[in-house]
């Protein structure tokens, strides 16, 4: 079995909360494989390419990937070519603002925000 019923339901819940973001992202695709389960596939549209894929292990794993992608959207929007570790105070405020609607629906995963931000210098 790829996931227990409980694990799959938890992953599906996270997927539904992030559904619009998942649909609109040009950086990745979330796919289902009958062989390995959910796969996070890094992609690009300009130029068109498929990069790496990794198996989503849990709801927390999917939530972490989605939150990280939301943060990267903010950094791309500001035109700064750096990682979250170098985000300035305004970027951090915007990242936290964009995370809030998701975390309000998934409060059990709020600790992931702290984990992502703890990578900062």
Region spans (language model):
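Acidic, low-complexity, intrinsically disordered interaction modules
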Residues: 35-99, 103
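Short intrinsically disordered terminal tails
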Residues: 1-5, 97, 117-121
